[in-house]
C-alpha cells in the first residue's frame, strides 16, 4: 500500500478492516500493526479558510440576495456550532440568547451574540417564522447538511475562494482559531466546541504551513 502512495491514515483504515476480518476468521495472531503516525505540526494551506476569505463569502451571499445563507455562515462561524446543530437555533433560543444543544446524552449551552440574535429575529419576522427552527427550506423543513454544503460551494467562484476551503466544518475551525487568539484557553474552547478531549481541540488549533514557516523564520537561527 505504501508503494501505491496511499496516505498513512488511509492505510491504517484499510489495515483495521483487514484485522477485523482476521479476527472474524479466528486468526487474531495474523493481525497487522497499524502505521505509527506523528501528530501533524501544521495544516495544509490549501484547506485553511482565512478571515478575509470568510468575509468575501459573506459579502457574496449578501450581494446575491441569499440572506438565509449569509446568516447561516455567520451563525456557524460566530458560535462554533456544528452544521448538524443548526436545528437548535430556534426563535425561542434566539429570544433567550442561548441554544441548548443535546448530543450523545449531553446538553451543551451555546451563547448567541446579541448582534446575531437581532439579525436572526429580523430574518424570522421577515419570513413569518414565529417559533421553532429558523433555517428552513421553502417546504418549511429544516435545511439539510447537504444543502448547506452545496449552497456554500456555489459562492466560491464569485467570492474568489478555493472550493477546497469552503465547507461548513471549516467555519467551525475558523471560529476555534479566532476564539483561541482572544482567550488563549484551550480548555474553555473545548467546552464551547463540545469536545470531550482537549486533544481533539488541539487539532483545530494546528497552524498552517505558512504560519509554521513564519515561526521558524522568526527564530533568527539562519544567518
Where are the regions a protein language model picked out?
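Catalytic-site neighborhood detector that most strongly recognizes the C-terminal catalytic loop/helix
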Residues: 48, 104, 193, 198-218
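Conserved tyrosine-mediated DNA breakage-rejoining catalytic core shared by Y-recombinases
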Residues: 79, 84, 88-122
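N-terminal core-binding DNA-recognition domain of tyrosine site-specific recombinases/integrases
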Residues: 1-17, 65-67, 142-146, 165-167
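Flexible interdomain linker/hinge and immediately adjacent N-terminus
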Residues: 28-56, 101-105, 138-141
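N-terminal core-binding DNA-recognition domain of tyrosine recombinases/integrases
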Residues: 1-45
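C-terminal catalytic core of tyrosine-transesterase DNA break-rejoin enzymes
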Residues: 74, 78, 172-196, 210
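C-terminal catalytic core of Y-nucleophile DNA break-rejoin enzymes
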Residues: 104-122, 132-153
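Basic, Lys/Arg- and aromatic-enriched nucleic-acid-binding interface segment
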Residues: 51-83
Amino acid at each position: 500500500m505504501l508503494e501505491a502512495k496511499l496516505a498513512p491514515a488511509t492505510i491504517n483504515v484499510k489495515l483495521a478492516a483487514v484485522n477485523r476480518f482476521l479476527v472474524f476468521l479466528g486468526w487474531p495472531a495474523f493481525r497487522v500493526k497499524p502505521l505509527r503516525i506523528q501528530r501533524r505540526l501544521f495544516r495544509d494551506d490549501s484547506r485553511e479558510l482565512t478571515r478575509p476569505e470568510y468575509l468575501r463569502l459573506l459579502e457574496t451571499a449578501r450581494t446575491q440576495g441569499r440572506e438565509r445563507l449569509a446568516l447561516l455562515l455567520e451563525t456557524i462561524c460566530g458560535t462554533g456550532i456544528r452544521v448538524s446543530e443548526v436545528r437548535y437555533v430556534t426563535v425561542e433560543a434566539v429570544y433567550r440568547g442561548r441554544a441548548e444543544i443535546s448530543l450523545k446524552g449531553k446538553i451543551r449551552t451555546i451563547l448567541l451574540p446579541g448582534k446575531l440574535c437581532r439579525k436572526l429575529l429580523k430574518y424570522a419576522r421577515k419570513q413569518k417564522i414565529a417559533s421553532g427552527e429558523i433555517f428552513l427550506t421553502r417546504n418549511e423543513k429544516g435545511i439539510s447538511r447537504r444543502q448547506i454544503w452545496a449552497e456554500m460551494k456555489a459562492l466560491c467562484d464569485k467570492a474568489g475562494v478555493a472550493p477546497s476551503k469552503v465547507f461548513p466544518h471549516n467555519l467551525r475551525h475558523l471560529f476555534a482559531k479566532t476564539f483561541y487568539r482572544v482567550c488563549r484557553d484551550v480548555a474553555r474552547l473545548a467546552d464551547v466546541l463540545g469536545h470531550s478531549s482537549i486533544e481533539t481541540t488541539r487539532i483545530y488549533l494546528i497552524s498552517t504551513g505558512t504560519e509554521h514557516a513564519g515561526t521558524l523564520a522568526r527564530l533568527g537561527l539562519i544567518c
